[in-house]
UniProtKB/Swiss-Prot annotation:
It comes from Rattus norvegicus (Rat). Its main location: cytoplasm. PANTHER family: TESMIN (PTHR12446:SF22), TESMIN/TSO1-RELATED (PTHR12446). Coiled coil: none annotated. May have a role in spermatogenesis. GO terms for cellular component: cytoplasm; male germ cell nucleus; nucleus. This is Tesmin. Pfam families: TCR. Residues 263-372 form the CRC domain. The gene is Tesmin.
Length: 475
């Protein structure tokens, strides 16, 4: 009797469940309730076959307030710093194409004479970039998009989804002028490959210029101004790369007329052996200029190389022409020249260039570079006095073609043999002439005239001796 009465009465739990899950309540709008298949036993708990506990998926989103319909504008206050997030898709849809063909300039692949197959796993680093012209930004991008795409630049090697999904994830609609590309850099740092993922799968080549320490000595490219690179557009990773050599004899496409890349390790040029004996900087005893060793980090190796060179030859860094004081023995070549046909009267003869005569240690043939040689006397004296346009057909003065006295240059002082002894003798003559005028009690003007006449006589005597030593006559 009591059990029947208690079973007919509704408890607080039943009233709460009817209030929440009733057909007239809004919370049950998105729930798919299924009726019970049969009467449950008294000892078993009733099971609610709804969207939370059932195996079937709900037909509509559970939280409509956080899932607006497509096309509806979402308030900025709701999203905050996340303007847009990519939709989650299964990895089965991301199917990369079977292969890409990459055209590489023949200058970038020395030794490659035909198509070669390079798998992606063979040390290739893929960097997603998008090349735009300088001064233009990414179309349709915003500061929030740029901040969202910034972390992508730190990825050096990653896996990409399909091109359609990557375009949606980038948040930047593609325009017809954009040229998204993937730059593949080998681990050795030797080449970079450029892949264009246009609609027609057209492949384009790209000129690359290595960066050296001294950019002024490197020939500049004839291409237009460099272009800026923006990271953001993700492209599918090809399974294999077919390296096809392309002869660089045609015009490059307008989309890739540039060679600017993101800042990274510079492409090092060919190594230069700077501690060898045939290095000009090392032979002259100076540090290398515009070389890879232009610093003090290799000082220990440089000191060892210098010591080894000096052990073999103590005079290795000494000049070929010895140094002497004024009035000492004449200079001579330490090894001697080895001229064959010039007669030692050309500038490439080291003895003639140093204005010294050949000695017994020279191995020259038909030498004319000696003291009493008339050709040497004429060549040593006349080039300092000749005008640059006297002989149009010859760049040097030949003794057979020379005729007449040389003309003095207008912008150059004449060479003279005036020494300190000549100056002292001239001053002594002038003082003697002044004392003589003072003893005779001449007027000041007459005394000045006598001193000037004595100076003219001394000067004419000096010039007479100078011309006589050169074989010239004064009319």
């Amino acid at each position: 009797m009591e059990d029947a009465l208690l079973g007919a009465m509704t408890g607080p739990e039943d009233e709460l469940g009817a209030e929440l899950f009733g057909s007239e309540r809004a919370f049950a709008d998105g729930l798919a309730l299924s009726p019970a298949g049969g009467a449950a036993d008294r000892d078993e708990l009733p099971v609610l076959a709804d969207a939370y506990l059932g195996a079937t998926e709900p037909g509509e989103p559970l939280l409509r307030a956080l899932s607006p319909p497509p096309g509806a504008e979402v308030p900025a206050a709701l999203l905050g710093d996340f303007p847009g997030l990519p939709e989650l898709r299964s990895s089965d849809d991301a199917a990369p194409p079977p292969a890409y063909s990459v055209h590489v300039l023949s200058s970038l692949l020395p030794g490659a004479r035909g198509p070669a197959l390079l798998p992606l796993s063979a040390g290739v680093r893929v960097i997603p970039v998008e090349i735009k012209e300088a001064g233009g930004g990414v179309p349709g991008s915003s500061p929030e998009d740029a901040a969202f795409q910034a972390p992508l630049a730190q990825e050096s090697c990653c896996k990409f989804s399909s091109s359609q999904e990557a375009e949606e994830a980038s948040g930047c609609p593609r325009k017809k002028d954009s040229s998204p590309m993937v730059i593949c850099q080998l681990k050795g740092g030797a080449q970079m490959l450029c892949i264009d993922n246009c609609g027609a799968r057209e492949l384009k080549a790209l000129h690359l210029l290595p960066q050296y320490d001294d950019q002024s000595s490197f020939p500049q490219s004839e291409l237009p101004k460099p272009m800026t690179t923006l990271v953001g557009r993700l492209l599918p990773v090809p399974a294999k790369l077919n390296l096809i050599t392309q002869v660089d004899n045609g015009a490059l496409p307008s989309a890739v007329n540039g060679a600017a890349f993101p800042s990274g390790p510079a492409l090092q040029g060919p190594p230069k052996i700077a501690l060898a004996g045939y290095c000009d900087c090392f032979s002259s005893g100076d540090f290398c200029n515009s070389c890879s060793c232009n610093n003090l980090r290799h000082e220990l190796e440089r000191f060892k190389a210098i010591k080894a060179c000096l052990d073999r030859n103590p005079e290795a860094f000494q000049p070929k022409m010895g140094k002497g004081r004024l009035g000492a023995a004449k200079l001579r070549h330490s090894k001697g020249c080895n001229c064959k046909r010039s007669g030692c009267l050309k500038n490439y003869c080291e003895c003639y260039e140093a204005k010294i005569t050949c000695s017994s240690i020279c191995k020259c043939i038909a030498c004319k570079n000696y003291e009493e040689s008339p050709e040497r006397k004429m060549l040593m004296s006349t080039p300092h006095y000749m005008e640059p346009g006297d002989f149009e057909s010859s760049h040097h003065l030949s003794p057979a073609k020379f005729s007449g006295p040389p003309r003095l240059r207008k912008n150059r002082q004449a060479f003279s043999c005036i020494s300190w002894e000549v100056v002292e003798a001239t001053c002594a003559c002038l003082l003697a002439q002044g004392e003589e005028a003072e003893q005779e009690r001449c007027s000041p003007s007459l005394a000045e005239q006598m001193v000037l006449e004595e100076f003219g006589r001394c000067l004419s005597q000096i010039l007479h001796i100078e011309f006589k030593s050169k074989g010239l006559k004064i009319e």
